[in-house]
Amino acid sequence: MNFVLSDVADAEAEKAIRDPLVAYNLARFGESDKRDLNITIRNDDNSVTGGLVGHTARGWLYVQLLFVPEAMRGQGIAPKLLAMAEEEARKRGCMGAYIDTMNPDALRTYERYGFTKIGSLGPLSSGQSITWLEKRF
C-alpha cells in the first residue's frame, strides 16, 4: 500500500474515490432527491448579472452561491432571492435552509432574514471566519 500526496487534480483518482463513496451512501441512506434550484438576475439583453445557486435534498435547501451586483445592493434583492428560494423549497417539502459565508455584510443580511448561526471556523489565513447558518421553516 502506498500513499501519494499531490497538489494536482486527478479526475481518475477522484472518480475512484467518489464512486464507491456514492454507492456506500446509497446503500446506507437511500436514493437522494437532490434537485437544483437556481434564480437568475438578468439584464434587458438577458445576460446574467447575479442570482442564487443552490439545491434541495433530503428535506433541506442549500444556498451555495448568492450574488447581487454592487449597483443593485441595498435594494432588498438578496432577501427577495432568499424568499423565492424558500418558497420553492417549501413546495418541495423542505423543512429549512442552510448557507455559509465569510462575508460579514452577507452574514448580517442572512441574520436579518431569519437565519441563525450554527457554527463557525476561524480565523482563516485571511483573518476572516466562515460561518454556517440555518433557517427552519
From Swiss-Prot:
Query: EC number(s) of the enzyme?
Result: 2.3.1.-
Query: What's the superkingdom here?
Result: Bacteria
The record's PROSITE patterns line, in alphabetical order, gives:
GNAT
SUPFAM superfamilies to which the protein is assigned, alphabetical: Acyl-CoA N-acyltransferases (Nat)
Disulfide linkages recorded for this protein, renumbered to the chain, are none
Listed A to Z, the keywords are: Acyltransferase, Transferase
Record bears the keyword Transferase: yes
A Pfam match is: Acetyltransf_1
Q: What sequence ranges are listed for the domain N-acetyltransferase?
A: 1-137
Which positions does UniProt annotate for CoA binding?
L66, F67, V68, G74, R108, T109, Y110
The molecular function terms of the Gene Ontology recorded here are: acyltransferase activity, transferring groups other than amino-acyl groups
> InterPro entries in the record, alphabetically?
Acyl_CoA_acyltransferase (IPR016181), GNAT_dom (IPR000182), YpeA/RimI_acetyltransf (IPR050680)
What does the function comment of this entry state? Catalyzes the transfer of an acetyl group from acetyl coenzyme A (AcCoA) to an acceptor substrate and releases both CoA and the acetylated product. It prefers glucosamine 6-phosphate or dopamine. It can also use the thialysine, N(8)-acetylspermidine, chloramphenicol, puromycin, polymyxin B, and 4-aminobutyrate ethyl ester.
Q: What is the name of the protein in this document?
A: Acetyltransferase Atu2258
Which species is this record about? Agrobacterium fabrum (strain C58 / ATCC 33970) (Agrobacterium tumefaciens (strain C58))
